[in-house]
Amino acid sequence: MDIYKFAVRPLLFDLVKADPEWLHQQTMRSLSWLSHTSDRTSTKWVQNILQKSLCLEDSRLEQNLFGLRFPNPVGLAAGFDKDGVAARIWSSLGFGFAELGTVTFVGQPGNPPPRLFRLPLDQAALNRMGFNNHGAAVMAARLADEKGQFSIPIGINLGKSKVTPLEAAAEDYLNSFRLLKELGDYFVVNVSSPNTPGLRSLQDASMLSSILDVLQKENNSHKPIFVKIAPDLEWEAIADIIGLAKTYQLAGIIATNTTIRRDGLKTQVIEQTGKAPQEEAGGISGAPVRDRSTEIIRFIWQQTQGEIPIIGVGGIFTPEDAWAKITAGASLIQVYTGWIYQGPMMVSQILTGLLSKLEEHELNSISEAIGLEFKS
């Protein structure tokens, strides 16, 4: 029996009605403690239990991409470990890679609470966090102390500081990258969060090109750089970004961030505010973005014939969800909202399901499944 799904989650969500952000903070405190006391006998015991319960190793799930070894294709999406306080523990929870951040050059408190809401009827979350984090320098100091101690690739998601005007965005991203470039395995240019005023305008080709230009000029260590896009873009805008990815030799595209659309939601009123989701600012993640993110993955694959790697994220709850994104063209996938709803067993359940899919389709490795929709 999945204790989290049938006991812990109902207790926290329905009976205690714990505030989502408070619950997240308590979770991060616990994971941070585990991550930074790993030399203690008691902590090692807990980590061993986690690894035995939550990790699944199989060579068919391994991939070598952008010069990095991924033990499995399921990663933690950005937004969960904003300051990298638990970076060493994610491998013990079964993840094949983890993306830290979003981090900004200037530390900032984010938007005022309440700013995180569950929409259980829609298997979704609505957030307007606003890139709350302690800043790139603080993350850099923390990761420098732990350098060489990670058993999975660690990505860093970079955002624009709220105090920085849009016309100075390129320098702001560059300042963060300079502090962190030797400490992350790959980097993500986040220009798609709806919760920083004007940020999504940086997805415009002229604005985005200035950011990518300065980053790649600085990128003498040749770290893989991705751009993360919104699900609400028109096809023409996505095609423009694909062109930039080729021009600036990006490692790939992450599809997608949260959506600002509200159509089709079952939730009528958000309990914490008494308002409808349509009245609340913020981005929606989870099941409502599932199909759109997969459509965009499929579009990118078709436009590039699979030449640009894609990390697929949005509405992944089950092995079938993961398989749909991989066969549409995603080399890797990331989870966040689904992990909150499904619990810590979710990663191993998805990996087990993916292995079953490989056997069903008589494939020898997960890499053979990438873009399977388009292979005869």
Swiss-Prot record:
<dbReference type="GO" id="GO:0044205">
    <property type="term" value="P:'de novo' UMP biosynthetic process"/>
</dbReference>
<feature type="binding site">
    <location>
        <position position="82"/>
    </location>
    <ligand>
        <name>substrate</name>
    </ligand>
</feature>
<feature type="binding site">
    <location>
        <begin position="336"/>
        <end position="337"/>
    </location>
    <ligand>
        <name>FMN</name>
    </ligand>
</feature>
<keyword id="KW-0285">Flavoprotein</keyword>
<dbReference type="InterPro" id="IPR050074">
    <property type="entry name" value="DHO_dehydrogenase"/>
</dbReference>
<feature type="binding site">
    <location>
        <position position="256"/>
    </location>
    <ligand>
        <name>FMN</name>
    </ligand>
</feature>
<dbReference type="GO" id="GO:0006207">
    <property type="term" value="P:'de novo' pyrimidine nucleobase biosynthetic process"/>
</dbReference>
<keyword id="KW-0288">FMN</keyword>
<feature type="binding site">
    <location>
        <position position="228"/>
    </location>
    <ligand>
        <name>FMN</name>
    </ligand>
</feature>
<feature type="binding site">
    <location>
        <position position="190"/>
    </location>
    <ligand>
        <name>FMN</name>
    </ligand>
</feature>
<feature type="binding site">
    <location>
        <position position="315"/>
    </location>
    <ligand>
        <name>FMN</name>
    </ligand>
</feature>
<feature type="binding site">
    <location>
        <position position="102"/>
    </location>
    <ligand>
        <name>FMN</name>
    </ligand>
</feature>
<feature type="active site" description="Nucleophile">
    <location>
        <position position="193"/>
    </location>
</feature>
<feature type="binding site">
    <location>
        <position position="157"/>
    </location>
    <ligand>
        <name>FMN</name>
    </ligand>
</feature>
<feature type="binding site">
    <location>
        <begin position="257"/>
        <end position="258"/>
    </location>
    <ligand>
        <name>substrate</name>
    </ligand>
</feature>
<feature type="binding site">
    <location>
        <position position="190"/>
    </location>
    <ligand>
        <name>substrate</name>
    </ligand>
</feature>
<dbReference type="InterPro" id="IPR005719">
    <property type="entry name" value="Dihydroorotate_DH_2"/>
</dbReference>
<protein>
    <recommendedName>
        <fullName>Dihydroorotate dehydrogenase (quinone)</fullName>
        <ecNumber>1.3.5.2</ecNumber>
    </recommendedName>
</protein>
<feature type="binding site">
    <location>
        <begin position="127"/>
        <end position="131"/>
    </location>
    <ligand>
        <name>substrate</name>
    </ligand>
</feature>
<dbReference type="InterPro" id="IPR013785">
    <property type="entry name" value="Aldolase_TIM"/>
</dbReference>
<keyword id="KW-1003">Cell membrane</keyword>
<dbReference type="GO" id="GO:0005737">
    <property type="term" value="C:cytoplasm"/>
</dbReference>
<keyword id="KW-0665">Pyrimidine biosynthesis</keyword>
<dbReference type="InterPro" id="IPR005720">
    <property type="entry name" value="Dihydroorotate_DH_cat"/>
</dbReference>
<dbReference type="Pfam" id="PF01180">
    <property type="entry name" value="DHO_dh"/>
</dbReference>
<keyword id="KW-0472">Membrane</keyword>
<dbReference type="InterPro" id="IPR001295">
    <property type="entry name" value="Dihydroorotate_DH_CS"/>
</dbReference>
<comment type="function">
    <text>Catalyzes the conversion of dihydroorotate to orotate with quinone as electron acceptor.</text>
</comment>
<comment type="pathway">
    <text>Pyrimidine metabolism; UMP biosynthesis via de novo pathway; orotate from (S)-dihydroorotate (quinone route): step 1/1.</text>
</comment>
<comment type="similarity">
    <text>Belongs to the dihydroorotate dehydrogenase family. Type 2 subfamily.</text>
</comment>
<keyword id="KW-0560">Oxidoreductase</keyword>
<dbReference type="GO" id="GO:0005886">
    <property type="term" value="C:plasma membrane"/>
</dbReference>
<feature type="binding site">
    <location>
        <position position="286"/>
    </location>
    <ligand>
        <name>FMN</name>
    </ligand>
</feature>
<comment type="subunit">
    <text>Monomer.</text>
</comment>
<feature type="binding site">
    <location>
        <position position="195"/>
    </location>
    <ligand>
        <name>substrate</name>
    </ligand>
</feature>
<feature type="binding site">
    <location>
        <begin position="78"/>
        <end position="82"/>
    </location>
    <ligand>
        <name>FMN</name>
    </ligand>
</feature>
<dbReference type="GO" id="GO:0106430">
    <property type="term" value="F:dihydroorotate dehydrogenase (quinone) activity"/>
</dbReference>
